[in-house]
Amino acid sequence: MVKKRLKKFLAIVLVFCLAGMFYYVQKPIVLTIGIFAGSNWNVPSPKSGKIIDDAIKRFEKTHPNVQVKYVSGILKDDYSDWISKEALDGKLPDVFMVLSDDLSTYAKVGMLEPLDTYMQMDADFDQRRYFSTTLNAGNIYDHQYALPYESSPTLMFVNKTLLEENDIGIPNINWTWDDFYSICEKLTVDTDGDGEIDQFGEYGYTWQNALSSNGQALYDEKTMKSTLSNNDVYSAIEFVRKLNRLNRNQNVTSEMFDKGKVAFCPMMFSEYRTYKPYPWSVKKYSNFEWDCLPMPAGPDGYNVSQMDSLLCGISKMSSKKKMAWEFLKLLCYDETTQESLFKYSQGVSVLKNVTTSKNVTKYIQEDAPMDASYNLDFFDDMMERAITVKKIDGYDQ
């Protein structure tokens, strides 16, 4: 009798153990990600969330026991505070987007897992597929703390109509500061004879723009020392002062450029992608023809510009780092995901074989009016030479 009861008890225990094991095996693994709604580039982007949602579906299909979850509806302006609060509460997502301004802080306080070992040990990962500039955006303090997800370089927008009306040709892609100044000087005039300048050469061109195109950055990333005492930096500042003197204390505004009264204006490529194609072209800059060029080169630099990148990293406190790395690669290294940036976002892919000059032109041409044509042959070279935007210990690069 005792033996029967013992056997029955052991059988019940075995059933519960097997049930527990089955539940443990079948229990879904939840991978959390941190994202924000809308565009990183502050332009209309109603479909940008589709890129992440599609990537999640593909990941869950190849990982049947995994669920990828995120909190929706967080705005970009609130995102940094939200991530910081999640970190303080011990609930930092396994994988999360990192704004370029936040990389230094997150790396310094230990929120981000260094990725150097993952990149070196993963036989399927080849960092040469990235533009060196885009990959460098996630590198700080001699470690790779994030991978680039999406980038947007700054270009020089040019009012073609204004130049043509004044018998001035569009500069070539190798134009210089001297070319830039010469055109601005010719176009900065009083057109109606009321004694006040009402047409201008440029709006928004800063000494930081000049600094990048003169072969300098605000600080040396290797020595972590400021470069402000260098002669090239001084030349950049003096050049912008010289440009500003043309305006004779007149305050040039973005509204003036929008109305076609200004020839040149630096803008991010994301704005070019948003406002060049129809229907957004009807809503902005509709009274003149415009296009973009690389930045004018300084005497000691090249036709390069600053480039901002949206990054993505792995939480240092994550218990699922191996799986997080796989999902990170799906966002930042997978060609399908990266190509979808051209369809549903306004930035460009961080991968060389996706963001070719030919591809960039093709995607813009598809959305543009039938009679429009664009020449972006300079894009590859510009991406590879760009100066990455970073903030280290409170200083912008």
Regions found by a protein language model. Give the residues of each.
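Conserved N-terminal structural module of periplasmic/extracytoplasmic solute-binding proteins
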Residues: M1-V109, P299, E335
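Extracytoplasmic/periplasmic substrate-recognition and gating elements
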Residues: I35, Q67, R245, V282-N353
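Hinge/lid segment of periplasmic solute-binding proteins
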Residues: I74, S100-P153, N287-P296
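Paired acidic/hydrophobic, glycine-rich loop segments that form the ligand-binding mouth/hinge
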Residues: D94-M97, A263-M268
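Short, solvent-exposed loop/beta-turn-alpha elements that line the ligand-binding surface or hinge
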Residues: D116-Y130, I173, D192-G195, F200, ...
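Glycine-centered hinge/linker elements that transmit conformational signals in sensory
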Residues: I183-C184, K222-N251, M295
